């Protein structure tokens, strides 16, 4: 019985170890399913963004970084989140419109 439990525990542990952060799927705002594997060999900056946050002007700085370093392998991924004080209540379409019209954002935004 102990051997059976040991084998079960090792099997469960092995399956947990097989999942690496770059294999976890996520969606972009346009609904495309991807993972960090798509950005292999690049420097990825993951940023929590919100359009009603005191740090919202960071979009401008992020876009400057994006334009300056995208050609050198930098990828900025904006992750809109409404979990911190309800500062991102909009839909994906509203968030994208806000980013592009107010800050001329071109870096990828992920699904909220």
Task: Mark where each language-model region is.
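Positively charged n-region of N-terminal signal peptides that target proteins for export
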Residues: 1-5
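Aromatic-flanked redox-active Cys/Sec active sites in thiol-based oxidoreductases
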Residues: 47-52, 81
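N-terminal "domain-start" segment that seeds a small globular fold
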Residues: 17-37
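Hydrophobic h-region of N-terminal signal peptides that target proteins for export
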Residues: 8-18
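Local sequence-structure signature of Cys/Sec-based thiol-disulfide redox active-site neighborhoods
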Residues: 40-47, 55
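Structural microenvironment flanking redox-active thiols in thiol-disulfide oxidoreductases
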Residues: 55-112
